[in-house]
Amino acid sequence: MPQAIHISPIDNVVVALHPIAKGTLVEVDGLSVTALEDIPQGHKMAVKPIRNGENVIKYGFPIGHATADAEPGTWMHTHNVHTNLSGEVEYSYNPAPDLAPLPKVAPETFMGFRRKDGRAAIRNEIWIIPTVGCVNDIAKKMVADNQDLVTGSIEGLYTFTHPFGCSQTGHDHAQTRKLLAALVRHPNAAAVLVLHLGCENLQHDQFVEELGEYDHDRVKFLTCQDVDDEFAAARSILKELAAYAGQFQREPIPVSELVVGMKCGGSDGLSGITANPTIGRFSDMLGQRGGSTVLTEVPEMFGAEGFLMDRCINHDVFVKAEKMINGFKEYFISHNEVVYDNPSPGNKQGGITTLEDKSCGCVQKGGTAPIMDVIGYGDPVVTKGLNMLYGPGNDLVSATAMTAAGAHLILFSTGRGTPFSAPAPTLKISTNTPLAEKKSGWIDYNTGVIADGEKTIDETAQGLLDLVIRVASGEQTKAEKHGFREISI
């Protein structure tokens, strides 16, 4: 079992794949270094002398600078490493020399649902979408009271509550309206009941205008203040929606029609070594089969955005990426916040030292394929291949945004563990084996076997593709089995 990994030949640190005790001789890539102190799993150890002010190199990239001299064997973390990040950056488009679409592979098929508009779906559910937080409990009761309608090919009746839709103005109000309308369009929802109160800011006419053309058999509306008994009215509508949803049956669909979101949360020092590279390899494999993937968490690209921007397929896509990234930075700066204060206490405990450290691991999920498009919050994926999406690092908000963009399912890597699931089935992928063993009720797939020396990234990526096809065909994720699913705007 390997003790550590030297990610790039030019790195001046290695990452402990397992806890390394003080005095242990670590041998990796022809380097022999004795640990001068205990090195926790996922944390960094210097393998070359690093002087005060000198860059700490990991992934072949500066992740910060040393704040004190460090000899080989020194633990390198928040006590002796500081970020190099500041504010906005003026980027230039320097296309990667090997920038080209990956070679195509014949797609496998999954057993999904074909909607009347031709889109593919992997679930056949009825959704209740409240337009305002005041009707949240009403929506929950409607779900509870009508579970008998979940029969035949209908796989669930769910509501996605939120506190918004009123007391919002301007951009906030527009974002709420846009996001909720995007959820109504999601193909995994065979049928949708949009639930209004009646007096909220987000009025029915506004919502219908945002929604655009829709199938009147698939989408129904109910305004609670307009009826004597909203529960009886909902029962009648839901029966109609169930009759509509029940006509869909699973059939073979090529994986080229899948849209998969890619997310990390509760990251640790192994995220960029095991789980995220596995997801990146999966992204390449799905793209070769004609499918689409979505990468977001823009603030967690800061410091590593160059990896992605040089892979934009053309200058127009590069300009959109530059605008998105600097727009997020300007948002922080305009609120008198620094751009680099992102890693959480759990991230740091797991070995992530700076935002650059976290970002270099985060972008591994993007694989090696060209970035084909950059899309806004609430906008749909329209281009095959790898897409970047405007969204924050927050787990709930970014996963909801990927669902709204049309992601059929989401791959969520984690080193610390999280039970959260978006409305789209959310697969939890552990970076380390101890987490997979401890939280078996949360984790769907373990890439810690890479750190254990049991499998390669190619092998875990193939296993992940196989699992995605099974989930797309109806196999439930751990979160689905627990009934976990929610949104945040």
Segments (PLM) and residue ranges:
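Metallocofactor- and cofactor-centric catalytic cores in central/energy metabolism, strongly enriched
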Residues: 1-409, 416-489
